[in-house]
Every structure is written in structure tokens, then in C-alpha cells.
Amino acid sequence: MKITFWSDFACPWCWIGETNLEAALKSLGRTAELEMKAYELAPNAPRMGGETTFPRLLARGLSWEEAEGRIKEVDEAGAAAGLPFAYGDAIQSNTFDAHRVRKFVEAHFGRDAAEKLSERFFRAYFSDHVELGNPEVLCRLAGETGIPSGQVRAFLDAPLDTGTEARIIADAVREDEMTARSTGVTSVPFFIINGKYSVPGALDQAGWEDGLKQVFEEEDRERQRGPFGAGVTCGPDGCSIDFDRE
């Protein structure tokens, strides 16, 4: 099974949805290839000096009570997934460089290292309340997950000239976002299972388990049947078709 999903480190439901997905796979005793694609909820957000969640919700027109309710809903969903959320104090910051660093890490250290870094980025944003647009923060967080911070620093400092690795990876982030638009993705998280089943939004663990069971059962049936369909067979009671010979 392959699950492709668009995600942003500034999206609380992305962290919750991905965590519940991984928990569901573990509960089912199954594995899947997980491919993350970059998405920016606020591409024009400042690298540093952004506002926390509460005033941003008020600026969107929510009342005081509605903003409190929105924050409480996220915190409770996070707690149910075992995540230490404090959504109200999260500081909005630009995530473009965080996406670039993740792709750099995946290219040089593998997908497991990139997934570990993603988890650290989410935790930093929603629990530690640091600014992911700050290159010093990105280097430190990478170092905490075992990635040489000096390599990350050199990558972030490199000019985005045509043909350079820094430019190629930056273009890959933009390509992910263009693919999202062409696919019809307008919000995250957004999951596509085996290239045909779309899951827009975060599910709880039970919701993931119910859906994944059906897809895995379908995979098992197809694996047993193969691509050839049913042919002519014979059994104890005879053959399904008799071929007359003259």
C-alpha cells in the first residue's frame, strides 16, 4: 500500500491525522509506504515575528468564545492522539524552508530520517512554540534528530541558483504545491491511498482502521487473483467448460 499525502508543519490537523494513521497501521499489524508532499497554508507568513493562534483566529472574524472553542477542539484531539498540543501559543511562521530541509534530509539520509524530522518540526511548532522560519531553529532541530546541523546550515545558506541542489529542492517544494492544485487539493491534510482513494482531512484512529481494513482486504483479494481474472477449471464434479473434439 502506498499513501501519498500533502501536509504542512503549521497545520495541527496534519500532525493529528498522520499520527492517527500511523497508530492505525500499527494496530492492524500492517505497513504502508508513506510519501509526504509539501503544502504551505500561509506562503506569505513571516519567517519570524508572527502572531500566535488566538489573535489570528480573532482576525478571521471568530468571536472570543469561538476562538477558544477552536483551540480547545484541537488540543483535545491532539491529546486523544497522545500529542502534547498547546495550539493557542503556536507562533505563525513561514514553513517553506522547513519543507526544503525535510526534502534535503530525505535525499541524503533517507525517508525514516525525514519522518523523524517531520515529527520534530510538528512538536517544535505546536508544543515548543518556536518559529520554523528561523534557520537557526531548523539547524538545531535537525541536529536533535541526528542530522549534522552544519550540513543543514550549508544547505540553507546556499544560493538558489539554477542547477544547484538548493534550487532543485526549492523547485521540488513548488512542484508539490502545483501538483496539489492540479489534483484539487485546497486544504490539508489530504491523503491519496494507492492512487485512487482520497481522504480529505484528519481521521481519528478508529476511522483510519475501518477504512484501511477495507483497502487491505481489497489488496489481498487482488494479490490472490492476480491480473488475469478467472480461467477454466476442473474439480471433483467435473469441468466448468467441456471442449468437444471432433
Residue spans of the language-model regions?
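C-terminal cap of thioredoxin/glutaredoxin-like
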Residues: I3-W6, E18-R30, M36, K103, ...
